[in-house]
Regions:
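Glycine-rich phosphate-binding loops of nucleotide-dependent enzymes
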Residues: 1-205
């Protein structure tokens, strides 16, 4: 579903609204122009070019921030990297190393840095902490919380119950392509979410 929202996949029915107005993104580029960021579930196949430097991965949607009149500026490039490597504590502090040489947590932080640089108003994260260690998870949760406090709306897709309950203000449960529940913080619990997630299957049985 989230790929349909950003124009990466076509949808058969329904509509997407932004600030109360219908929008139809033909490609992810259209979504980027509206400051909508998307962090995919499979970072190694969809989020990064593993044999390319982590720096160039971060520049791919931010070329205008490190160039003037189409010409790359070394000072802007250096400042950009210093800012985000420091802010997100990306390690090792070597932006010219290939992305594959970074741990899963640091790869994910580099992807977040790339999209944070566009100053998103909406950030969609698909399974943002899958396959990373506990320490990196805590850092990513903190980054998400800070973005939210600055006014960025966060849409997180997750299959981890503790993550959902710990991070979300509102939960929308989907099962077999349809919404089965919409719960705010005062309403949701593990039991209610699990019941809603199996609702369609139970009806079919």
């Amino acid at each position: 579903m989230v790929k349909s929202i950003i124009g990466a996949m076509k949808y058969d029915s329904g509509e997407v609204k932004l600030n109360g107005k219908p929008v139809h993104f033909l490609s992810p580029h259209d979504a980027i122009q509206e400051h909508i960021a998307f962090i995919p579930e499979n970072r190694k196949e969809e989020g990064l070019f593993l044999d390319t430097s982590i720096a160039n991965n971060m520049f791919m949607v931010n070329y205008n921030r490190i160039s003037r009149k189409g010409i790359l500026r070394k000072k802007l490039k250096k400042n950009f990297l210093n800012t985000f490597f420091s802010k997100l504590d990306i390690r090792p502090n070597d932006p010219e190393k290939p992305a594959r040489d970074f741990s899963g947590g640091n790869q994910q932080k580099a992807i977040l840095a790339k999209w944070m640089a566009i100053e998103p108003t909406i950030m969609i994260l698909d399974e943002p902490t899958r396959g990373i260690d506990i320490g990196a998870k805590a850092e990513i949760y903190k980054l998400m919380d800070n973005l939210s406090k600055k006014g960025c709306s966060i849409i997180m897709v997750s299959s981890e119950m503790t993550e959902i309950i710990g991070m979300c203000d509102r939960v929308i449960v989907m099962a077999e392509g349809r919404v089965t529940a919409e719960l705010d913080r005062t309403e949701f619990s593990q039991e209610r979410i699990m019941a809603a997630s199996s609702e369609t299957t139970q009806k079919a049985g």
